[in-house]
Amino acid sequence: HRDLHSFHHDALPISLILVVILGIYFNSAPDGGQISFNILEISKIKIPMQAQYIFFPLTFVGFGVLGALFPFHTWSPDGHSSAPTAVSMLHAGVLMKLGGYGCFRVAIFLMPEAAHELSWIFIILTTISVVYGAFSAIVQKDLKYINAYSSVSHCGLVLFAILMMNQTA
């Protein structure tokens, strides 16, 4: 059971993001120019829609695992409860927010067309994260589990707002 959580938390997001980074890297110079890891340089190149349809979901899920996107949120409560309190607070306050930042800065920034077309799928998943995290936090007795599930709910709300793709959200 712990091995499955470790896979979701460690190997899955890293693998998905690595595949996308390499795919974008090798497509960053379609005319034979210099390839780059600079996100501003890559953003100047139009990634083909077929590639965006593959890369956007992989990138969003990869970073979404860090942001406790449903159904990949299961690592978070166990991580919070087994960690020392200070680490648990850093985990909730920093690590999980990096998932949302990665979704925004990489997935949506580099692949906005696919983000507009496919966002409804992830809006459903983030809505489930918000509701499931909130109701799970309500029924918990352990403070660390309350923090963990409320963080799942909060990060779901952050990802939901990012997927709205407007300044108000």
Can you annotate each of these PLM segments?
Residues 1, 5-12:
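Short, small-residue-biased leader/transition segments that mark boundaries at the very start
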